[in-house]
Amino acid sequence: MKIVVLGDKDTVLGFRLAGVHETYSFEDTTHEIERVRNKIMELIEREDVGVILITERLAQRVEIPDVAFPIILQIPDKYGSLYGEEQLREIVRRAIGVEIKR
């Protein structure tokens, strides 16, 4: 199963350097947001994609489909996290039924 990253060019570059082979960079424009939506739908249909990582700022601009597979996770970009810690807690709570607290 492949990991695919969607985000700004700097975040995508970091993941490429870490060994992720399939990455897509997008600018924060209206035209690009439509391309992001199309790319997400295309990736969901592919059987070889197991995880889609998308930057939080990009995810705020598009509606992320609620699908069981592939797993879609929001990640911080070069500016830091918007709300990633809370989202991770919610994912764990839904997956295993345990709430993580500090």
Curated annotation (Swiss-Prot):
It is found in: Cell membrane. GO terms for molecular function: ATP binding; proton-transporting ATP synthase activity, rotational mechanism; proton-transporting ATPase activity, rotational mechanism. GO terms for biological process: proton motive force-driven plasma membrane ATP synthesis. It comes from the Archaea. The keyword Ribosomal protein does not apply. GO terms for cellular component: plasma membrane. Transmembrane segments: none annotated. It holds the Pfam family ATP-synt_F. It is a peripheral membrane protein. SUPFAM superfamilies: AtpF-like (SSF159468). The keyword Transport applies. Disulfide bonds: none annotated. Gene3D superfamilies: ATPase, V1 complex, subunit F. Keywords: ATP synthesis, Cell membrane, Hydrogen ion transport, Ion transport, Membrane, Transport. InterPro entries: ATPase_V1-cplx_f_g_su, ATPase_V1-cplx_fsu_bac/arc, ATPase_V1_fsu_sf. Belongs to the V-ATPase F subunit family. Component of the A-type ATP synthase that produces ATP from ADP in the presence of a proton gradient across the membrane. Has multiple subunits with at least A(3), B(3), C, D, E, F, H, I and proteolipid K(x). This is A-type ATP synthase subunit F. It comes from Thermococcus sibiricus (strain DSM 12597 / MM 739). The lineage of its organism: Archaea, Methanobacteriati, Methanobacteriota, Thermococci, Thermococcales.
